[in-house]
Amino acid sequence: MSNAETSTAGWGLIAGNGRFPFLVLEGARSQGIEMAVIALKEEAAPELVRSAKRLHWVSLGELSKAIDLMHQEGVTQAVMAGQVKHNKIFSAIRPDWKLAKLLFSLPRKNTDTLIGAVARVLEDEGIRLVDSTLFLKPLVPEAGVLTRRAPDAREAADIAYGLGVARQISSMDIGQTVVISDRACVAVEAMEGTDETVARAARIASGKPLVVVKVSKPGQDMRFDVPVIGLPTIEQMKKAQATALAVDAGRTLLFDRTKLIELADAAGIAIQAIAPAAEPAEPKETSAGMNRE
């Protein structure tokens, strides 16, 4: 951490949905840091009231209010944690004048462009967004097999194939997850999220074994939209008869990491974290594969 990041004062948390904000609060508190929380009304869990000592609610479009509250709290550096559903970002918000002006100026209307622009506005206001995994490094896996079982030859071939597909769709800001069977792409994530993508793949594959690959974006900005795997994903994989999961090492958060790996081991699911610069080459041999129409 830099000198600024080792300070216990001036910390804020911009909270979306899910467990991510709670984990950041716990991680920061373990280092003696008490965060002021700006919680998004449309997304953040009401239970944050019990977890945060200083909490303020704002709507998705209230950028000016959020900045004013952070100034009042003395926030100079902040973590953005928790999902904001992609379909809400441009369709469900009522922007204040500052956000409306920002939206009008965007060259492309996508999530990365918007949040990147918000980060620049915050920076101009003296509030620096930092790596959202800063307080959760034990939950970010290094390269290697995380479960008792390593992917077998079939799964390794599907992982190699899936990495190529996933890299392509993530570079186009379509999604970050693909589901593969016998080196055929069964499902590609869009706005529905990883778990729904796996469920859809199960319906399409009709019992064929599946492999799930989830990657980061090229040049992943660790301040926001970091890939996350949680217990519900492993549960969904189990239901879908998915037998292996590959994620990016150093760029993925595994919520409830110990329990997640135990659950995967119990289900016979192999999990491998792969260094983006050292991806395995796709095997040359062919296999029958699933028919694609």
Residue map of PLM features:
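Feature captures the catalytic cores and cofactor-binding loops of soluble hydro-lyases/lyases
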Residues: 40-75, 92-101, 196-293
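Short coil/turn connectors at secondary-structure junctions
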Residues: 6-10, 31-34, 52-53, 73-76, ...
